[in-house]
Amino acid sequence: MTDIGILPAPAIAYGALSPMLIMFGVAVVSVLVEAFVPRGHRLRTQLALATVGILGAFVAVVALSGSHQVVMNGAVAIDGPTLYLQGLILVASGLALVVMAQRRTVAAVPSAVGAGAGGGLDSFAAQASSVPGSEPERVLNRTGITQTEIFPLTLFAIAGMMLFPACNDLLTMFVALEVFSLPLYVMCALARRRRLLSQESALKYFLLGAFSSAFFLFGSAFVYGYAGTVELDAVARAVDADAGERSFLLLGVAMLSVGLLFKVGAVPFHFWVPDVYQGAPTPVTAFMAATTKIAAFGALLRVLYVALPGITTDWRPVLWGVAIATMLIGSIGAVTQTDVKRMLAYSAVAHTGFLLTGVAAANERGVSSTLFYLAAYGFSTVGAFIIAGLVRSGNADDGADGDYKDDDEVTDLRRWAGVGRRAPVLGIVFALFLLAFAGIPLTSGFVSKFAVFEAAAAGGAMPLVVVGVMCSAIAAYFYVRVIVVMFFADPVEDSGVLRIPGPAVTVSIAVSALITVLLGVAPQPLLDLVENLADFVT
């Protein structure tokens, strides 16, 4: 009788995988909370569970510092970039999650600056499936019932994002991509106000995201056809040996790039960014704008620097073109916007171009500068979107009738006139984030742009540096324009007001602002750290 071979199961390195296992475990428990915990106790339970999970995963990341190994039969790499990016994702997620946890009921109506004490700011529908203004929604609003499904969705997204930059083979990378993408599609549709716009943006994101994921999977198949493997280090060895049909490799890399460049929001795969950033609930926008970019750039760096260093001369010119187009279209597109969230979305596209400048440097300094830039940009982005979500129309509305027009978010730049003068502290902090985006000295943005430009120049990519400096000058215009409107324009009849944030949200804003200033005034400790960590395990 012939023995049937048994596929060996991979040895699970629980210690090395502990940050991701903690987040996946907490996400599963969060689903059980939704099923079994009474509705009245879910919010506190979910918030406590998420807090414990994020803190536990962060402690596990710190405990693994210095680890340099490949586990799960080559599927997952635990090294400096992995742990650094996982730490960034956890901290940025924690800051955004605080805002997601804000809830209000009919009895707790938020107040405008100068009009009394502040309250919670609820950005999420009581029941996303109900028609806006319908009787079921009115009943839910009157009873103070709020949905908490956002917590398990967010936790699964965080877990997938932590796995994404750690993946050492293309199939695991695809699974991680879907694990964090699918919750984001749903989260974008949960807005309490402007529900149809929110659902439209989610549908666009889902359709385009599915399309890009198909390209990624198809590209993985072509790379496998070339190398006979999907492990990144084995692909690199096959490339060095020129072991297969080169056209398969180049076509596969092109398709992989479509999937990855879509996630970072690079031109020409950026069209979803303005619509989704505008339509999604602002706390979700803050979360995804920072963490998705961190995770996706980590995966892009690993693919290019671990699997494809042997064909740098092939992918580098293409990346140059993508970076230049992304910087130009992002900067010019932002100038034409009159909606603050869409302006910040085009700003995010431009920053993707700056980050690609560091990636295209194709040297170790390019990796370290990109890692630094991700930290600087991530925290400024979270803080900026949190404050943007606090600008509301002037009259508080209890929402008992299901109509929240009187407490809608104000994103029309014209209606931001005088907002900074009416709430000077929050206005100054928001101006700080905008100046950091512009790359003004003594902010994190200046140091991060200088770092990627220096790396690109050292790698012989001076055209990218020239375009980057030019686009930074263009960007300064639209950032300063917002500041001028906030502080120097006379208020209009329907000007918005800044709601007073609660203590937890205030802490999130303060932490984001503090990091933005520290990375601009004293960046050397983090620069030294990323230089020591910029070494991928192979």
UniProtKB/Swiss-Prot annotation:
Please list the GO terms describing molecular function.
Answer: NADH dehydrogenase (ubiquinone) activity; NADH:ubiquinone reductase (non-electrogenic) activity; quinone binding
- GO terms, biological process: ATP synthesis coupled electron transport
Q: Which residues form a coiled coil?
A: none
What does UniProt give as GO cellular component?
plasma membrane
Protein keywords = Cell membrane, Membrane, NAD, Quinone, Translocase, Transmembrane, Transmembrane helix, Transport
Compartment list: Cell membrane
Ranges annotated as spanning the membrane: 12-32, 47-67, 81-101, 144-164, 170-190, 205-225, 248-268, 294-314, 317-337, 343-363, 371-391, 423-443, 472-492, 502-522
Task: Spell out the protein name for this chain.
Answer: NADH-quinone oxidoreductase subunit N
- From which source organism is this entry? Mycobacteroides abscessus (strain ATCC 19977 / DSM 44196 / CCUG 20993 / CIP 104536 / JCM 13569 / NCTC 13031 / TMC 1543 / L948) (Mycobacterium abscessus)
